Amino acid sequence: MTAIGLMSGTSLDGVDVALIKTDGRRVSALGPTGYRPYSDAERSLLRQALAEAGQLTRRDDRPGSLGEAERMVTLAHAEAAANFTAQHGIAREDVDIVGFHGQTVLHRPAQKLTVQIGDAAALAKAIRVPVMHDFRAADVAAGGQGAPLVPVYHRALAQSLDRSGPLAVVNIGGVSNISYIDGHETLIACDTGPGNALLDDFVLRVSGQPFDAEGRLAAQGQVDEAWVAAALQHPFFAAPPPKSLDRNEFAALALPKLTPADGAATLTAFTAGAIAGIVPLLPKLPLSWIVTGGGARNLSLLRMLREKLAPASVENADALGWSADAMEAQAFGFLAARGLKGLPLTYPQTTGVVIPMTGGRIARP
C-alpha cells in the first residue's frame, strides 16, 4: 500500500513528510520526502504549550495555549500534506493511509499519560484521506512506555542491509533513542537520554538561533567534563531498557557559568555520553551505529560519538540510502500500514509492554 507519514518532533523545527510503499512488514520503496518548517511565532507557541502541558492530568484537556497550539499543528500538517502531494503529483485516491503522529507536549508513562496535540478528524477532512493517529495510547494504557515507536521500522530497513552482527540505529531528535538490532529476532529499544532539546534551548537563549548549525558553536568550545560526569549520574542512565523520557526531563539541570561555545560543547558531550552509556546495557557491542534525526547534521556530536564508540563505525543514515531527516515521517507511514493490518507496533523489549501491541486509531474524511 501507499502510505504518507507526517511527523513533528520534540525539536519543534517543523513537519516532516514522507511517502513509502509497504505491506506493513517490509518496505518495498521509499518515495519522496518534504518539510514544512515552523515559523518563529509557531515555534514560540509550541514552547508555550509545552510549558503549560506540564500541569495536565488528563490527555484530552487543552487549557491555556494548548487549544490554539493544537489548531496550529493541525493546519500546519494539512498544509504540509497538501503542498507535498501537489509538488509531487500524488493523487489523494492513490494514498491508502496517512500516519499522523501529532506534537508530543507531555510524556509521563509512569502516570499512564502521554499527550499528542493535533486534530486527526479535522486533518482527515482537510486532506480527504484516512488518517491513522494516536499511536502511543494503547501501549501506555497496557503498561508500556509508549516510546520509542520507530524501532519496528528500523528493523524493516535493516533487513535490506548486507551486514552481519548487531547494529544500532540512533535517532537524535529532541530526545535520543536507540534501536538495537541483531538479526531478525532481537530488537531492543529505549530512549538513551537528551538529544537536541537541551542544546537547542541553550543556543536559542544565548544566541537567538534555534539550534547549533552543524555543531559549529560546540566545535569552538571546551567541554566541562566534571559537569557531564555529574549529569550522567541521573538514575535514568543506569536503568536497563526499555525506558523513555519526556522532552523536558533534564531541563532542571543547570549549567555553570560558561561561554556560549563551552556551554554548547558541554551539552553536546552530555548527549554523546548518554548514547554511549547505553552500551553496557546491551546484549552485545554493536558493530555499527547509524545516526538519524537532526543530530545527524551536528558534526561535533558525530565526532564525539565516534570517539566514544570506537572501534565501532558511526555513520549518517543518508550514507545508506536512508533519510536521516525523514526517518520518523517514513516510520509513521509504516506504522500506519501496520496498524491497518493489526500488526504489532510495540514489543516487550521496545516499550516494556506485557505483550506485543498494535495501536493507532483511524479518522476518516
UniProtKB/Swiss-Prot annotation:
Record InterPro entries: Anhydro_N_Ac-Mur_kinase (IPR005338), ATPase_NBD (IPR043129)
Q: What is its EC number?
A: 2.7.1.170
Under which main EC class is this enzyme filed? transferase
Q: Which GO terms describe its molecular function?
A: ATP binding; kinase activity; phosphotransferase activity, alcohol group as acceptor
The UniProt annotation places ATP binding at G9, T10, S11, L12, D13, G14, V15, D16
Catalysis performed (reactions):
1,6-anhydro-N-acetyl-beta-muramate + ATP + H2O = N-acetyl-D-muramate 6-phosphate + ADP + H(+)
Name the UniProt key words of this record, in alphabetical order: ATP-binding, Carbohydrate metabolism, Kinase, Nucleotide-binding, Transferase
Can you tell me which residues the record assigns to a coiled coil?
none
Q: Which GO terms describe its biological process?
A: 1,6-anhydro-N-acetyl-beta-muramic acid catabolic process; amino sugar metabolic process; peptidoglycan turnover
* Pathway this chain belongs to: Amino-sugar metabolism; 1,6-anhydro-N-acetylmuramate degradation; Cell wall biogenesis; peptidoglycan recycling
**Function statement:** Catalyzes the specific phosphorylation of 1,6-anhydro-N-acetylmuramic acid (anhMurNAc) with the simultaneous cleavage of the 1,6-anhydro ring, generating MurNAc-6-P. Is required for the utilization of anhMurNAc either imported from the medium or derived from its own cell wall murein, and thus plays a role in cell wall recycling.
| Family, per entry | Belongs to the anhydro-N-acetylmuramic acid kinase family.
What this protein is called in its record is: Anhydro-N-acetylmuramic acid kinase
